[in-house]
């Protein structure tokens, strides 16, 4: 049975932890508002750029002049999975859910005899994947020193990915991130970014004349589109991280409150039992006299 001192120390420790989780919840809530606004602002641009490029690409006949980012290598043997996770933990199942989606895709591809490699953005995903797939991670991009996430960060990642593609290191690149829906809902999402794939527009499309030629426009814009899609994914991930962290810290704060109540009840009962025992001893001693 724990002593009163042990129980007091335990209660004080949980109260200190509760203060930390409450503070982290408030910080995450403040950062979430900014991150959510950034993610929601990036969505229309990324979707519109994808749509415009899709319209241009629909009128292109694949040939030797077609940009490789659109035509691809013509193979489907080597896959690069671009995995975006967080640099820090204490965010519930945020990273685990993304890695689970990555594992499902990787195991499916490996089962089909494909060569699978990983390009990690964020240390948490890297730490899990390097244990699961040793020797298959080609690069880690660490963003811990980045205070304000900007397009330049996505552009740098895109350049590295495209450079590896041009060197023939992979045939297909799929981007994994967490799509932010709400504070309690973040959906792991997979998006193929190389070679570019576009959804077909519904209904008849207008006919345009382009200057310069479509292939030249695509050659200029497809690399930028890779960066734009990665930037959108990073912003979605950032909002998802803070939403998940806020929920996790809120749950931790509530659990700490429940634990404090439970330990306080045990403390009061133990103290009452000790007082009762002392009274019995005093009365017994008086009767003996």
UniProtKB/Swiss-Prot annotation:
It comes from Azorhizobium caulinodans (strain ATCC 43989 / DSM 5975 / JCM 20966 / LMG 6465 / NBRC 14845 / NCIMB 13405 / ORS 571). GO terms for cellular component: plasma membrane; proton-transporting ATP synthase complex. This is ATP synthase gamma chain. It is a peripheral membrane protein. Belongs to the ATPase gamma chain family. F-type ATPases have 2 components, CF(1) - the catalytic core - and CF(0) - the membrane proton channel. CF(1) has five subunits: alpha(3), beta(3), gamma(1), delta(1), epsilon(1). CF(0) has three main subunits: a, b and c. It comes from the Bacteria. One of its GO terms (biological process) is proton motive force-driven plasma membrane ATP synthesis. InterPro entries: ATP_synth_F1_ATPase_gsu, ATP_synth_F1_gsu, ATP_synth_F1_gsu_CS. PROSITE patterns: ATPASE_GAMMA. Pfam families: ATP-synt. Keywords: ATP synthesis, Cell inner membrane, Cell membrane, CF(1), Hydrogen ion transport, Ion transport, Membrane, Transport. GO terms for molecular function: ATP binding; proton-transporting ATP synthase activity, rotational mechanism. Gene3D superfamilies: 3.40.1380.10, ATP synthase, gamma subunit, helix hairpin domain. Its main location: membrane. It is found in: Cell inner membrane. PANTHER family: ATP SYNTHASE GAMMA CHAIN, ATP SYNTHASE SUBUNIT GAMMA, MITOCHONDRIAL.
């Amino acid at each position: 049975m724990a002593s009163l001192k042990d129980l007091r120390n335990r209660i004080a420790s949980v109260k200190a932890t509760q203060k930390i989780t409450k503070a982290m919840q408030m910080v995450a809530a403040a950062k979430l508002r900014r991150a959510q606004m950034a993610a929601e602002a990036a969505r229309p641009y990324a979707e519109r750029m994808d749509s415009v490029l899709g319209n241009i690409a629909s009128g292109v006949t694949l040939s030797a002049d077609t940009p490789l980012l659109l035509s691809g290598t013509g193979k489907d043997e080597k896959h690069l999975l671009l995995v975006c996770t967080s640099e820090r933990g204490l965010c519930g199942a945020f990273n685990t859910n993304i890695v689970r989606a990555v594992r499902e895709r990787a195991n499916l591809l490996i089962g089909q005899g494909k060569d699978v490699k990983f390009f990690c953005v964020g240390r948490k995903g890297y730490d899990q994947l390097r244990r699961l797939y040793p020797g298959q991670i080609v690069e880690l991009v660490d963003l811990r020193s980045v205070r304000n996430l900007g397009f330049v960060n996505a552009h740098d990642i895109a350049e590295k990915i495209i450079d590896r593609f041009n060197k023939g290191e992979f045939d297909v690149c799929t981007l994994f991130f967490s799509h932010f829906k709400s504070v309690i809902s973040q959906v792991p999402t997979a998006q193929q970014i190389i070679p570019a794939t576009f959804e077909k527009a519904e209904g008849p499309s207008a006919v345009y004349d382009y200057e310069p030629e479509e292939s030249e426009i695509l050659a200029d814009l497809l690399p930028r589109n890779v960066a734009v899609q990665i930037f959108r994914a990073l912003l979605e991930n950032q909002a998802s991280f803070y939403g998940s962290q806020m929920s996790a810290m809120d749950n931790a704060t509530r659990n700490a409150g429940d634990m404090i109540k439970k330990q306080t009840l045990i403390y009061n009962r133990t103290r009452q039992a000790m007082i009762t025992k002392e009274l019995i001893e005093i009365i017994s001693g008086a009767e003996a006299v």
